Amino acid sequence: MAAAHSSPGFPLIAKGGALSAGARAILAMGNLHDGAEEGEEYTQPPAEVTGNDVLSTAWRVSTLLEQGKASLADLQIVIRHLRDDAFLRRATRLHRYPGGTSSSVTEDRLKGVVRQVLDTAFGRTNDSEGADVPSRTATEALACFRNELERTRYAAVFTAHPTFAVANEVYAALASYASAPEPQDVAPDMLSHRRKAPPTLEEEFTLASAAILRGRDALDRLNVELLGAASETWPEAWSSIVPRPIIMTSWVGYDTDGRTDIGWWDTLRLRLKMKLFQLQRLRQQIVDSGAEAATLLSRLSRACYTVEAQIAACPKSADLEATVEFATLIVDHKEAAILDPAVLGDALQDVIDTASPEAALSVAVARAGFFAHGMSASHSHTRLNATQLHNVIRQRLRFTDDPADPAHRRALLAHINEALESVSAVPVDFGALLVEQASAARLMMTVAQIVKHIDSTTLVRFLIAETESGYTLLAALWLARHFGIDDKIEISPLFETREALMGGAHIIEEALRSPHWREYLRKTGRLCLQFGYSDSGRYVGQLAATYLIERLRLKILDLLHVWDMEDVEVVLFDTHGESVGRGGHPFRLSDRFAYLSPMHVRAKFAERGVKYREESAFQGGDGYLLFGTPELATASVVTIAEHTFEPATRHDDPVYDEPDFSSDFFSTIADAMTGLVADPGYADVLGAFGPSLIDKTGSRPAARQSEGGGVSPRITHPSQLRAIPNNAILQQLGWCANTIQGLGSAARRHPETFETFREGSARFRRALDFAAHALAHSDDQVLRSVIWLLDPGYWLDRATAEPRSGKRERYLSVMHDLERLDFWADTQSMFRRIQEDHLALRSIWPEAPTIHPAEKLLHAIRIALIEKIWVLATQIPFFMPRGNFTREVMMQRILCLEIPSVLRELDAIFPRGGSKLDYNFHEPAGPQVDNSYSQEHDEIFQPMREMFQMMREISVALMHGIGAFG
């Protein structure tokens, strides 16, 4: 059901028969309907809610429901209308984000990329008359062209981060609407946009691989243009060029950081599927080209059949007999399955040399994609955390000191260097893999089996989360050497905490002091680094995080000079999400790349002659949207190519010209966000009922679970939440603190300079785009209304103003239960901290965006639903404790909105009962006394269930408005 009228800026639901009077009245509260019906008036709310328009609106909604002038069905209609309007606006933004999806515009942009590459190859410059003057001969230009294209410069990394926030058909509809030539004004008719269940790992893999294959198709379009231009420019030499400037990469199924539900058999099965996709793709491309290639096609078919058999035999658990059968197929038939793309190199070149020009180009494009990605549809990243590595080293080498203790750091570094001197490789087989208990060793052994039996040439990234010491990198190197694959993996630290971002250069230097690490870097030719924008954003603030990451990159560049390692390529992998709180620029994909990888840093690397590769993440369902259709995928790849081939030249920018101000400004933000994170009230407001506002959005096990029917553990620090739910909760509370906290304090310190930078610095303006978007979805009155809900005093005031004794007692009951939770004092002081900073920002930046009326109305409706659920819960009849489930526990969990689990308990305590038995039991019928609790179900439990579902649908509507989950 869609809004009758929609505009990018302001939805207006037209008056008419499609809406009930109750729905129209609710929409009118947010000025989203063209007026209430004649005679519809609003009673003024009581004094305790005046001064807060969100609570006032919530009170009016509740009053309409109580008076029978609106029903829950009316609320559901309103929520769907507002959700659908947000969906349409999100689709329009998605259309614009990669620069539009028009095929003609995309084609022109592709040709523009090719012109840029050719201009660079020939060294063309404009003469005094404006004509292009090449500075290189055709032969020299060919060498330069080849150099530009045959080195990978960018990787799109597809991850399974839990942002699968809506049903798959909703994502498909979003991508389809965004790919339409014109904005649509009628949303798809769906009762709910929510998922029926969290995605499984297999489902995540299916969605990721579909996005990757669309990305591969888009890369082929780019290569058609590049190789087509090469064939016209160098007709005798073009066919030997194998471009690979941009690649696709995945860690879906290979990421074991913080999860134990992915077995080595899962990783190998999914990796074999990616190999099969690659082989099938190449075979189909050669068939479609029309070239004569019978022998090559036969070889590819045999490889496909072999890999299919390997996949079918892959165990589903640590099953000994199944593993033996699998080993037979994967070890004994690895040559038939093809281990190295080079095996097909001569055959592919022969086909290109003998085919017609059109077929030759098609096969050359197919070969480029095949050689760029190896024996997989994408490159592979594995991931684990530093603790897992430390544990296996402690087990293998008996190092008992704690790597986190600085007092033991030097001794540990000395010990691991000694161990690297003497380490020798041990064999790896599936028997050893079956019995291995250490997760880090198991992952390294799994990688060893991949490079031995699936793909022998493509390096595998080995990402290490929570890296806090150079010791961790050397420990990973020891483990790789121990299993004989140190030349096959790219060890990469992840920097995302404030400590890691501030001390990251020291971590790298600790590793560089080891001759073994330097030897390893020279052997692989790359220093791989990963930068996390989610955790860094939530701990130091998103705007400060990017500044710290930028500084860290330049410090590492200096270290390479100090250690004479400037001939090593640096891989800069930015792990970010689609939301502003997680590093995704809100308005343009091109600005996202410029924000993550500022031209100033790129130019510094170029000036030093240090090669670098950029990588950035497309995370979960939200991230895959940019590859959700062929049109979106091609527009995204073109944007990547434009960024990748843009010459790295430094531009004047006050951010770099006045480093003292920049340092002070971003440090102030970081200090303010750090202070907020440490505030007990911040953890309280995140943990009170925030986790219950969002659905489970990934296959990764939840960090926060209720046990034994008791009260869920209280969140005492944001670190007890994962980063994505943390950020998603902030969005749902109407305050994107991770993006705007501290900005007011920083601006207040230098108001004139702040204004100057806003007007004169592209780098600064790009950062403020994040704040602008966050402010457009934040409102201090929304946050204050949440905090007031948690205040027993608010409920006492409601009780005092309530003339009906029954209702008064219910308010007092809620008050007493909230007193037991004891959120009030800390959340109030935390709010004062936030509001003071916000007032400072508004005084310096008065024209900053404000929240959309539709979003504010959604927040108000949800406040009304929460109040109604809490008050309704006070009517639940007395019951005897059921295990740990007592009435006190029940109310605490209801106040935390853990409604589904509470209702499961109540369904068991108060069974609805069955229908009357109408059978012949061969004697006079006795009275069938109805001892069921159907009235409680109809009047309490079912309304609570319906209202909770509506709250979750509101969360989806708000998420559509923001444009991303978490």
Each language-model region and where it sits:
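Often metal-dependent polyanion-binding catalytic scaffolds in large enzymes
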Residues: 1-412, 538, 566-571, 576-587, ...
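Core mixed alpha/beta domains of very large multi-subunit molecular machines
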Residues: 378, 392, 402-492, 501-517, ...
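Phosphate/diphosphate-binding loops
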Residues: 505, 547-558, 607-611
